[in-house]
Amino acid sequence: MKTFTAKPETVKRDWYVVDATGKTLGRLATELARRLRGKHKAEYTPHVDTGDYIIVLNAEKVAVTGNKRSDKMYYHHTGHIGGIKEATFEEMIARRPERVIEIAVKGMLPKGPLGRAMYRKLKVYAGNEHNHAAQQPQVLDI
């Protein structure tokens, strides 16, 4: 018996919508990364993007445990000398709540072209509205 290998043109991708209200950031991100990769499917193949599209709503209402709301730091560099910037979780949620989930999930995906293709299937929105109704997403309870 031969080993099954999924082909990119035959992979069936579904659309799912997830409500992040009250969900713990890391636990939510691991499940999102798993589904973006396609590891929940029987036809999973490591070198083929077999994952589904995920829409995350209410990113501003995601929860963290302990003192992470004030202690967790996010860093980025502007590219200029001495241009390291930092922001706490609270500041990130106030400024760009979508980025918190995007950063958490992106760190759990493979690095390289395949990981970038998987990351592009993640759509995160701060509020309760999204513009993907035409794709008829199914509600995914995590």
UniProtKB/Swiss-Prot annotation:
Family classification: Belongs to the universal ribosomal protein uL13 family.
Its job: This protein is one of the early assembly proteins of the 50S ribosomal subunit, although it is not seen to bind rRNA by itself. It is important during the early stages of 50S assembly.
Disulfide bonds: none
Subunit architecture: Part of the 50S ribosomal subunit.
UniProt entry tagged with the keyword Ribonucleoprotein: yes
Protein name: Large ribosomal subunit protein uL13
GO biological process entries: negative regulation of translation; translation
Keywords: Ribonucleoprotein, Ribosomal protein
GO CC terms, sorted: cytosolic large ribosomal subunit
SUPFAM superfamilies (alphabetical): Ribosomal protein L13
GO MF terms held by the record: mRNA binding; structural constituent of ribosome
PROSITE patterns: RIBOSOMAL_L13 (PS00783)
Lineage per the UniProt record: Bacteria, Pseudomonadati, Pseudomonadota, Gammaproteobacteria, Enterobacterales
